[in-house]
């Protein structure tokens, strides 16, 4: 579980309470700022200071520091490490460094050609100021259930490279996310890169989400990917987010559609099966059944677009 997880949850629920009491902090507690020159140096610092936190884009960390919801002894700034800022294609895989910003994903022609789902999703993340600061590694490490990129990695079948003092390991996206703001990342480890398979031209992808306003947290979202062959859908993956405690696949609905045409009748039947695998967690103003309805609306939209 991430050391930041309780703090992130607290950010969502405590700001109004603190403001109403008049005790909102706007400056962080004292900490030591460290800017390592290599990944190895960063890992050494994290190993020496168990309560240290990593600063990548800072989109989520800085508000938590300012509100004193986290008070680390050290903040390790990895933003200047070129080894974590790459876009490359090799052996059928697109590799994305953890420090790539959301705006980089949205603007990259390489990403557009190799993984259009990621580019489409990046354009939905927050507002331009957020996309200019937030990083792909930070989003995945934070594992916000309402985040766009974790669902995309799940839909594509991506994998995540993690590095610690003991070496590197690669974790499939399907097992990386374990709960609300929780991943398999261990203290002292850094998320180094993401890899996604470069898919054939017959694959089609759709990204969509529902929010009260553009840039708000999603009430429900969907990253969909499938292969259209002679009018029939194959290998369909429907990854929903902002529904449960982590992104999840609607396996039963996808299995029903395997080998079938995306006719209106088939799509409608598949929508009724989403609840077999997706079990939404309600929030104020958007209960479980409302979220499930949103998921159905998104699925119908996405599948209709894939069929067009």
Regions found by a protein language model. Name each.
Residues 2-8:
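Local cysteine-cluster metal-coordination motifs and their immediate loop/turn environment
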Residues 9-308:
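C-terminal structural segment of proteins
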């Amino acid at each position: 579980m991430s050391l930041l997880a309780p703090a992130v949850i607290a950010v969502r629920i405590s700001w109004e309470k603190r403001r109403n009491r008049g005790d909102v902090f706007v400056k962080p507690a004292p900490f030591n700022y460290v800017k390592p020159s290599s990944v190895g140096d960063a890992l050494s610092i994290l190993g020496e200071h168990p309560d240290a936190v990593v600063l990548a884009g800072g989109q989520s960390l800085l508000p938590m520091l300012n509100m004193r919801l986290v008070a680390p002894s050290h903040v390790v700034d990895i933003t200047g490490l070129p080894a974590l800022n790459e876009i490359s294609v090799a052996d059928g895989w697109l590799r994305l460094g953890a420090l790539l910003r959301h705006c980089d994903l949205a603007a990259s022609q390489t990403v557009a050609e190799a993984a259009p789902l990621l580019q489409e999703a990046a354009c939905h993340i927050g507002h331009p100021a957020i996309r200019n600061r937030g990083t792909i590694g930070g989003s995945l490490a934070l594992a916000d259930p309402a985040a766009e990129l974790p669902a995309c990695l799940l839909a594509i079948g991506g994998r995540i490279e993690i590095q610690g003092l003991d070496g590197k390991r690669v974790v499939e996206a399907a097992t990386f996310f374990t709960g609300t703001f929780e991943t398999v990342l261990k203290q002292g480890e850094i998320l180094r890169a993401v890899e996604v398979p470069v898919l054939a031209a017959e694959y089609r992808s759709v990204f969509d989400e529902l929010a009260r306003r553009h840039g708000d947290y999603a009430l429900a979202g969907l990253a969909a990917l499938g292969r259209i062959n002679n009018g029939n859908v194959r290998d369909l993956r429907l990854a929903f987010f902002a529904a449960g405690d982590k992104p999840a696949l609607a396996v039963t609905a996808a299995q029903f559609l395997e080998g079938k045409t995306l006719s209106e009748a088939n799509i409608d039947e598949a929508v009724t099966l989403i609840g077999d695998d997706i079990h939404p967690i309600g929030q104020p103003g958007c209960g479980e059944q409302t979220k499930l309805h949103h998921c159905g609306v998104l699925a119908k939209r996405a599948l209709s677009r894939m069929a067009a």
